[in-house]
């Protein structure tokens, strides 16, 4: 059936002529250069930084010639998260993590900037001369070629000023990004479909009716700020966000944030600044002032307006500020009537939050939408703008965006604080490359119950799956589930869990190496180990004793290297010293006061066959930990044992130092949990100090986790080694320490900005999701708060609740059962319970 209603084609009314060399040329001979704008991330900007951004915008706009238009468009489009499950090599937990966020809605944000050079005549036109209202468009020719060249030079200056600001980056759009290609839609196409999809943009009919505008099924509502009476009495660059502020800290957002990311519906927030002839504006104002003065006796409002106009003129002349015209609008859309009513009310409420008067505009929606076409800002109706100064106009610019994915191939997945979707964060390599940090070491501080274990499990799992060697030192069995999961997945090749139990005591063989070779580091570690067994912590060996011990170790190594039939272990070493080495020192006539061999053997006897600790150094398992990628030393049962703990400590350090030196080009991490307190002997302190200062040279990182910062500073060596050599600081919920946070701030050298971010942790968590927030600071210059949200599968793997761990083991059928199968069942059960709670019948 033929359409009998009068319809107009988009082609006939289309205001753009072409895109040449990245410049949009309109049929009215306007030139427009388009940029994509990279704004700072939400909740990471301070009041001073907002001021600096504001100042940069002002400097940049001032370089543009007269009759230029600055149009900044912030697009906020609802989308759903698409999990990255294409990689066939994904582990069970990685896949579970991605699927946990499947189809989670979020508000995607893109910011574009259009700099347009128009003419004096065009800038004065009203809505009745808009290209929508004219019968036909005849392309005009650019008559002043020099003006076009000057404008393009000014645009380059504008771009350079903004990029040099350090807060905002502009990227000039290429021709294909504006016009699109056969495979991908361009920006203009996206505007006509109100979509940010890169794959397809479905063009739909545009319906213009009195009081209503539709694009396909999307119904548009428009709120405008087009009069000074709509604005609050005072504009500022930023505002305090109460939900994440405390009486001791501030969380700042840009003044226009309520109509930005805080407005959770599909919308475009457009900000226009029109640069006219400043002298002409002031002359017009002078004339208006005189007219109102002459008419003031007839109306009080004329007198008031004359007074305001005089104040405007005084401000312009005394401070030399630039008079401009300004307009802002929010175009929101929805597909059904109920949602349309909701977004209309929400938009009005958010404008009211800015202390602006919400003006719901129905008549001018098509005209203002049409002027928002990229490159068509010169078509904006002049009666919809108001006079102000550049400083005030720029206050209405939205100043933040969503969290961004790091471009680095390495990193961890954490959740966006605003939308709750995964973001890729690199806290090691890229910051190092950019000079933000000088080492990869990390200091993690969080009280009990703040989510430390979940965060560290989440961290080390992702490091391991990206090829890193992980060595964990723990008390409390926090990593038991993850270690067993890795052990099962690798069929025992990885996931080595070393702990002390009565029926399965901890045991090593310091004389075993997979290659049968003993380098200098291995010999030194054996010497240090035996010296620790022989001498008390406060007892220093004589030089002659050190020489004798080194000689014994070297002689025994020579013997076992020459005769491979000898099984090397501590028992063999003890017997070698008892017989062979005794003979050797007698031949050398070593005096007893220089080396008391009988006293030496007497002290070491408990570790020899039949002694109380004969299990410790005589393991029959041929296990070289250097090649194992995930090792957990669980020290809970020996943390107070003065004999076992020093020995195990040395084994740990020897293992990691061997990894450091031998594994070239492979990432290494040692993570020391709360047990570091028990390891703070004089020897261990020196090890920690050495480790934190040198691990960066071997592509490694040392991580210390603690509940109390005071525990760290009680040891001057540790304070100097750990805090001063950890450029990455990670803090969890500090609300229970809020009254003494100044102490923590001083010890860790935190800035006021970082303090505000840390104290905002968990202040405004989403009620429908279970997660804990974590603050990550890099080098004192780059910091943000993220959410540690894990899947149900990860939850049951990482949990430290004893009842939940026992339930997992029960369903798995004991240590030999299928842990993955048990976790799948429990996770599914938990999801079903959550569905029943959220959807009760």
Language-model segments: residues:
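Extended, folded cores of ATP/NTP-driven motor/assembly subunits in large transport
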Residues: 1-400
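Short glycine/proline-enriched loop/turn "hinge" motifs that connect secondary-structure elements
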Residues: 23-29, 102-107, 318-323, 415-417, ...
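The start of beta-strands in P-loop NTPase/AAA+ ATPase cores
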Residues: 31, 109-111, 469, 629, ...
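Hydrophobic positions in the central parallel beta-sheet of the AAA+
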Residues: 35, 113, 442, 631-633, ...
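P-loop NTPase motor domains
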Residues: 40, 47, 51-63, 263, ...
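Short, cationic low-complexity segments
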Residues: 132-161, 354, 446-451, 796-823
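Conserved P-loop NTPase motor cores
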Residues: 428-461, 470-479, 496-504, 636-756, ...
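Conserved P-loop NTPase
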Residues: 751-810
